[in-house]
Design a protein with these regions (language model features):
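Conserved coil-to-alpha-helix start sites within the AMP-binding
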Residues: 1-16, 90-108
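ATP-dependent adenylate-forming carboxylate-activation enzymes
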Residues: 3-7, 22-33, 110-130, 139-141
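Conserved pre-ATP/AMP-binding loop-to-beta segment of ANL
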Residues: 4, 35-50, 80-87
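Flexible, low-complexity linker/hinge segments
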Residues: 21, 25-46, 70-72
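Conserved AMP-binding A3 loop
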Residues: 45-73
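Conserved AMP-binding/adenylation subdomain of ANL enzymes
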Residues: 70-86, 94-134
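Gly/Ser/Thr-rich phosphate-binding loop
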Residues: 134, 148-206
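Short Gly/Pro-enriched turn/cap motifs at secondary-structure boundaries
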Residues: 207-213
């Protein structure tokens, strides 16, 4: 049985301050192939990640805590995340985008609400029950959630999305469900964190439109 998001987070945090370094891999990868381990773990490494966006075999890349966490204040400011934020997020922490955002919110003392199953009716219930005001989902899940929303929700002020494209047609759907929201689409990589971002006012259907650098 796969570990819950809560269990994944506890396991990741449990390695902090120990000699062990966790390696973040896709949920369907049970172990790291020895062929990827080509060098010693560098001093100060807090985790290992697999390079993303490559057509070839991914490479194992180690990151220090500072290379990752030092960017939290910048991304939180751009996305409007504060200690009062109540964000809904769904998905495994094997996706480093989820892990990054979880820890950036926790660093502020913000609240994270999640649900394990891919069930938009459950998501809608949890969002309403916990007075969520921000969403973080990949675009395909955002579309699913917006279609299942039984009524518009003015409480949602921020929508974060990444890893997939999001066009103007998608924004019409999202704005109908969350009329007072501002949507941020970002592009990033496990080995680099966030790279570029744009808001819903800047989105179009041109796949080359990736926004401005962080």
């Amino acid at each position: 049985k796969a570990a819950s998001v809560h269990g994944q987070l506890v396991r990741f945090l449990a390695f902090s301050g120990t000699s062990r370094v966790p390696v973040i891999v896709p949920a369907d990868m049970k172990y790291v192939p020895e062929s990827l381990i080509t060098e010693e773990i560098p001093a100060g490494a807090c985790m290992g990640v697999l390079t993303s966006g490559s057509t070839g075999q991914p490479k194992l890349w180690f990151r220090t805590l500072d290379s990752w966490a030092s960017f939290f204040p910048i991304q939180n400011t751009i996305f409007g995340i504060t200690a009062e934020t109540r964000l809904f997020c769904q998905g495994s922490l094997a996706f480093t985008g989820n892990l990054n955002l979880y820890l950036s919110l926790l660093s502020l003392g913000a609240s994270i609400i999640t649900a394990s199953p891919v069930n938009p009716s459950v998501w809608c219930r949890e969002i309403e029950l916990h007075h969520v005001d921000a969403l973080y989902l990949i675009p395909s899940k955002l579309r699913l959630l917006a279609k299942y929303a039984s009524h518009s929700s003015p409480d949602i002020k921020t929508i974060l999305a990444g890893s997939q494209s999001l066009g103007r047609g998608d924004m019409v759907l999202l704005k109908a469900a969350y009329p007072d929201s501002c949507c941020f689409l970002y592009y990033g990589a496990s080995e680099l964190s966030y790279v570029t971002w744009l808001t819903d006012q800047e989105m179009n259907d041109n796949p080359a439109c990736i926004g401005k650098p962080f």
